[in-house]
């Protein structure tokens, strides 16, 4: 039906007869001629209809925006005065000789001349995807997946599919359950990841596996989360954590070169403890130059009890955050930041403006200065490398709360004051995560990554004796404050796997019920293995410069896990439920999926 794409025509096609298919992007009548901008997935080209081509000209008079058409004509060079350097096809135009209207269009419910609400865009997603910026994002996504497949194939990895209907296993989030018609009362679970299957593939001898795969998690959504998402899933046998990281770093490095022509350089490696200490986050955004400084040793004996109490409690932190040029902040600004950190559990935010550092306590402005000595103030100024015109924020309290609150404040202030270099790329590896997280209230332990992660350099007995403080052989790749991938060395011995399950409070009977197949497989010569998974959607989001993951998925869900276009989820009919032996005891009253 066509010989070329609109956006791929150029001066090399001058004199050629071509046939194009696409949509009317815009129509205008000028000096007895009809001009249209014709659009397809590759771009836009100008088409003009001359009255001498009577039939085509007559049909062209009926054209309106978004009519779907076919045009045949001859490519010709535009006069120099009419060259449009803002268009990829701006040096040429198509002289139309025939026109077919495939389909007419009603007035669009989306207005291309103004910003449409996301709700409206998602309701008419098929129209939203016609927009060049949306089309370009999906094309980039396709380019990324093709690149990943070529890279992984070249490294000797095998693309192996794993099941979509599987067994519910505890992996952190809630499962999406699928009822079985044949086995009434039983349910499949949609996989949160192919984790156990890819480990079983290692046990089967497929020592290099990858898959670009859909995963499902029934969890609260954020701007960078979806209930169904895509992973680049990787697993290897007989490779160390360092070797896995080396291969994956090469892939991401090559991907950025291919898509953006950006050299990411070597990725620095930072421990979890260092990341939390310096940045208050296990996914630090290194584009922001500010760091958290622990000053507990400097304020243990001050009269300000908020500082002194926290400084003398090993479970607490006293943190200083120097803001370059921050002395210009108003009291209203500071109050707003104080309110901001309260979201993360902080009970307050102290501050100090540095007017003349050389004068010590006399050269600073702070509501807490009266509780501090000149020596303490000088020590704080030295520890934070403060200079005249800076402001120092302080937080004191429990370690977790302070890391979260001051880490979030660091990010917000960095953006607000334009201290963060938004044009830079700052990747790194974060390693040596805690094996377990301890609930501050109950003291119970949960796996920080998942229960199949191997500890570093511990026997099952040593891990059981001292689980708190154990370090996992785990690693995350972080780019510009986003965790784009995470992985670990896996447990490959039965005794260690049972020990981890027991520490997590999973009884032997529950272990057999939920993970019997895995425990059995670990008895038969399981090789050492390690892996990693990248969030494809998040990678595409970064590479296309958007901050909303819904912009890089063709048909995404809302933050309420609903599809506004199809009105999913929807009620099932009674016959279908009866066949599945399911009785609905409570229904959602509202059908509003917003």
Curated annotation (Swiss-Prot):
For this protein, the record's SUPFAM superfamilies field holds:
Class II aaRS and biotin synthetases, GAD domain-like, Nucleic acid-binding proteins
Q: Which keywords annotate this record? A: Aminoacyl-tRNA synthetase, ATP-binding, Cytoplasm, Ligase, Nucleotide-binding, Protein biosynthesis
Region annotated Aspartate sits at 195-198
User: Which reactions appear under catalytic activity for this entry?
Assistant: tRNA(Asp) + L-aspartate + ATP = L-aspartyl-tRNA(Asp) + AMP + diphosphate
Q: What is its EC number?
A: 6.1.1.12
Q: Which superkingdom heads the taxonomic lineage of this protein's source?
A: Bacteria
Q: Does the keyword DNA damage apply?
A: no
Q: Where in the cell is it found?
A: Cytoplasm
Task: Name the enzyme group at the top EC level.
Answer: ligase
Q: Name one GO biological process term.
A: aspartyl-tRNA aminoacylation
Name the positions where ATP binds: 217-219, 226, 483, 535-538
Q: Which Pfam families match?
A: GAD (PF02938), tRNA-synt_2 (PF00152), tRNA_anti-codon (PF01336)
Binding-site positions, L-aspartate:
171, 217, 449, 490
Which GO cellular component does the record give, naming just one? cytoplasm
User: ATP-binding: is it a keyword of this entry?
Assistant: yes
A GO MF label? nucleic acid binding
**What's this protein's function?**
Catalyzes the attachment of L-aspartate to tRNA(Asp) in a two-step reaction: L-aspartate is first activated by ATP to form Asp-AMP and then transferred to the acceptor end of tRNA(Asp).
Q: Which family does it belong to?
A: Belongs to the class-II aminoacyl-tRNA synthetase family. Type 1 subfamily.
Its protein name is Aspartate--tRNA ligase
Q: Which organism is it from?
A: Proteus mirabilis (strain HI4320)
Give the gene symbol.
aspS
């Amino acid at each position: 039906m066509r010989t070329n794409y609109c956006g791929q025509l150029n001066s090399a096609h001058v004199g050629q007869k071509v046939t194009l298919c696409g949509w009317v992007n815009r129509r205008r009548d000028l000096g007895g001629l009809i001009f249209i901008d014709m659009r397809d997935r590759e771009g836009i080209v100008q088409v003009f209809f001359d009255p001498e081509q009577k039939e085509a000209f007559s049909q062209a008079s009926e054209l309106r925006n978004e009519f779907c058409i076919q045009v045949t004509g001859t490519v010709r060079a535009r006069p120099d005065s009419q060259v449009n350097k803002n268009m990829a096809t701006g040096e040429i135009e198509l002289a139309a000789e025939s026109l077919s209207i495939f389909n007419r269009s009603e007035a669009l419910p989306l207005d291309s001349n103004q910003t449409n609400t996301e709700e409206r865009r998602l309701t008419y997603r098929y129209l939203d995807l016609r927009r060049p910026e949306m089309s370009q994002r999906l094309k980039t996504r396709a380019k990324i997946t093709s690149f990943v497949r070529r890279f992984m194939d070249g490294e000797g990895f095998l693309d192996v599919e794993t099941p979509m209907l599987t067994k519910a296993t505890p992996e952190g989030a809630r499962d999406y359950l699928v009822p079985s018609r044949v086995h009434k009362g039983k349910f499949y679970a949609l996989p949160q990841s192919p984790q156990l299957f890819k480990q079983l593939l290692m046990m089967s001898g497929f020592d290099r596996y990858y898959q670009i795969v859909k995963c499902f998690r029934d969890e609260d959504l954020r701007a960078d989360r979806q209930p169904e998402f895509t992973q680049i899933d990787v697993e290897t046998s007989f490779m160390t954590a360092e070797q896995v990281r080396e291969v994956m770093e090469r892939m991401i490095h090559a991907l950025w070169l291919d898509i953006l022509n950006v050299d990411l350089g070597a990725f620095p490696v930072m421990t979890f403890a260092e990341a939390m200490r310096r940045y208050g986050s296990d996914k630090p955004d290194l584009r922001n130059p500010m760091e958290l400084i622990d000053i507990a040793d400097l304020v243990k004996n001050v009269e300000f009890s908020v500082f002194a109490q926290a400084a003398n409690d090993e479970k607490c932190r006293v943190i200083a955050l120097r803001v370059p040029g921050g002395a210009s902040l108003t009291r209203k600004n500071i109050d707003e930041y104080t309110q901001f950190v309260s979201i993360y559990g902080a009970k307050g935010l102290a501050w100090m403006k540095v007017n003349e550092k050389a004068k010590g306590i006399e050269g600073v402005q702070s509501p807490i200065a009266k509780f501090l000595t000149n020596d303490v103030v000088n020590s704080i100024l030295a520890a934070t490398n403060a200079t005249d015109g800076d402001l120092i924020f302080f937080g004191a309290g429990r370690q977790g709360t302070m890391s979260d609150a001051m880490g979030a404040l660091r990010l917000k202030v960095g953006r607000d004051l334009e201290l963060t270099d938004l044009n830079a790329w700052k990747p790194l590896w974060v390693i040596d995560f805690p094996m377990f997280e301890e609930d501050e209230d109950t003291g119970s332990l949960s796996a920080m990554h998942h229960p199949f992660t191997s500890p570093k350099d511990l026997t099952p007995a040593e891990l059981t004796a001292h689980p708190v403080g154990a370090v996992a052989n785990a690693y995350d790749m972080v780019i510009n404050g986003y965790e784009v991938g995470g992985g670990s060395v896996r447990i490959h011995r039965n005794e260690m796997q049972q020990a981890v399950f027991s520490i997590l409070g999973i009884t032997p009977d529950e272990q057999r019920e939920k993970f019997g197949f895995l425990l059995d497989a670990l008895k038969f010569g399981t090789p050492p293995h390690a892996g990693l998974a990248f969030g494809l959607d998040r990678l595409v989001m970064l590479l296309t410069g958007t901050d909303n993951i819904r912009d890089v998925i063709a048909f995404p869900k809302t933050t309420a896990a609903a599809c506004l276009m199809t009105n999913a989820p929807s009620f099932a009919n009674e016959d279908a439920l009866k066949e599945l032996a399911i009785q609905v005891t409570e229904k959602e009253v509202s059908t509003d999926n917003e």
